[in-house]
Amino acid sequence: MDLMDLTPKTDIVVVAIKHPSTNEPLKNDDGSDMTITVYAPYSKEYKAVVHAIANKRIKAAQGKKSADYTMEELEAATMESLAKTTKEWNITYGGEVPKLTEAKAKEVYDKVFWIKAQVEQGVEDSLGFMKA
């Protein structure tokens, strides 16, 4: 047994977007599958984003008597993390294939809220890379 056999082979997760009611794969106008690719939680890119967000929160809490974290702040940090760890996408939104930016990713994940859950589930499923 080689320990390298028990490590992931890629630092990305490609999530095929499915219709929220029928679970059918969604297609773009060109016939390609709609996909969103994100960095995996063990990747250096993902860790850099999480560390930056945590460091920002730690710095903001320094010197304060309370380090309370509101639900709104938690939700915003989660959205920021997802937007910044989205590597690429192949989606149709608003009749076009939008350029991936952090702001556009936040917009898509907010407006088409069920996609966020699919991406999060895809990442969670990818962590089972060692299963037989």
Where do the protein language model's features map onto the residues?
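Short, charged/polar N-terminal "headpieces" of proteins
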Residues: 1-61, 128-132
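Flexible, active-site-adjacent loop/turn segments at secondary-structure boundaries
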Residues: 1-4, 87-89, 98
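Exposed, low-complexity/repetitive linear segments and helix-based recognition motifs
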Residues: 2, 8, 26-27, 42, ...
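Generic structural signal of hydrophobic/aromatic residues within well-ordered alpha-helices
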Residues: 3, 46-57, 78, 82, ...
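Short, flexible coil/linker elements and helix-boundary hinge sites characteristic
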Residues: 23, 31, 63-65, 86, ...
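Intrinsic-disorder-associated interaction segments
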Residues: 35, 39-42, 47, 67, ...
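Negatively charged, Asp/Glu-rich surface segments that serve as flexible interaction/assembly modules
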Residues: 49-89, 93-94
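C-terminal charged interaction modules
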Residues: 91-132
